[in-house]
């Protein structure tokens, strides 16, 4: 019976004790209680945990991630100078998204089979776009309504570019992910017209983008701070964004070699970053 309980859990870590109870029950054996099942799993080192959420990465993209990481593994502060890191993120005003649980051995949080695949952006109260470089925190722009290629082009033209020229001059490289609105022909024409150099970027690679940890920094700075409406929430986000010191940026950029090595070691699967 114990062997069947462990097998059922390892076949699908998302199975609950009730699911396992149903799958191992047979006419010739007593039905184990849910409490007994949980105890057997804990003794075997399979504890209930919330799964880390990471993007589902295809084989093709895993190979591209490893190749990119190898190409940039030796890059240091000099190579990453004048690079602009950008992304969008949502911030919930009330509570969090749905909670899911899995059972996994201790120390296996980032193993692929114990991750929860995600799709970027679900719903949310406030959506923002932001960027930064090695020398300056960039603007934080609120996105109202649907973020499409036209809204994105407007952000590039009227928010990103003026800041970049004022802080980085005319020689800089822009990073963006491969979201369809970022790579649309409409936006590609803008980059060509403005002669913007783009950093080649592997798909499904938020763990290689240090701005992802900047969003986490924002969350930490606003932990426990309540907002009564979306306008107030954005005002809080913007104030917290402007208060982030450059030491945080420097620490994130110094992590790039480790991020690249982690991707290589994970064979392209999502990493802890």
From Swiss-Prot:
It is found in: Nucleus. InterPro entries: RNaseH_sf, Tc1-like_DDE_dom, Transposase_5, Transposase_Tc1-like. The keyword Nucleus applies. Keywords: DNA integration, DNA recombination, DNA-binding, Nucleus, Transposable element. It comes from the Eukaryota. Belongs to the transposase 5 family. PANTHER family: TRANSPOSABLE ELEMENT TC1 TRANSPOSASE (PTHR23022:SF134), TRANSPOSABLE ELEMENT-RELATED (PTHR23022). One of its GO terms (cellular component) is nucleus. The keyword Cytoplasm does not apply. This is Transposable element Tcb1 transposase. GO terms for molecular function: DNA binding. GO terms for biological process: DNA integration; DNA transposition.
């Amino acid at each position: 019976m114990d062997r069947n309980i462990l097998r059922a859990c390892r076949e699908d870590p998302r199975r609950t004790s009730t699911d396992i109870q149903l799958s191992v029950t047979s006419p010739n054996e007593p039905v184990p209680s849910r409490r007994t099942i949980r105890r057997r799993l804990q003794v075997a080192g399979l504890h209930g945990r919330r799964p880390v959420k990471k993007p589902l990465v295809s084989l093709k993209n895993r190979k591209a991630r490893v190749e990119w990481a190898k190409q940039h593994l030796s890059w240091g502060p000099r190579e990453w100078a004048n690079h602009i890191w950008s992304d969008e993120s949502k911030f919930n005003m009330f509570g969090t998204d749905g909670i899911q649980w899995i059972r996994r051995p201790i120390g296996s949080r980032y193993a692929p089979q114990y991750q929860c695949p995600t799709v970027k952006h679900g719903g949310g109260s406030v959506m923002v776009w932001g960027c930064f470089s090695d020398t300056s925190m960039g603007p934080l722009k609120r996105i109202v309504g649907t973020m499409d290629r036209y809204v994105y082009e407007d952000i590039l033209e009227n928010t990103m570019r003026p800041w970049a020229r004022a802080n980085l001059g005319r020689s800089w490289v822009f990073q963006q992910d491969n979201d369809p609105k970022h790579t649309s022909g409409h936006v590609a024409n803008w980059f060509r017209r403005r002669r913007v150099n783009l950093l080649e970027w592997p798909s499904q690679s938020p763990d290689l983008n240090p701005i992802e940890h900047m969003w986490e920094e924002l969350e930490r700075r606003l932990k426990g701070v309540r907002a009564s409406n979306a306008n107030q929430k954005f005002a809080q986000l913007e104030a917290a964004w402007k208060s982030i010191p450059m030491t945080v940026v420097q620490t994130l950029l110094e992590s790039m070699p480790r991020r690249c090595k982690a991707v290589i070691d994970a064979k392209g699967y999502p990493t802890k970053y």
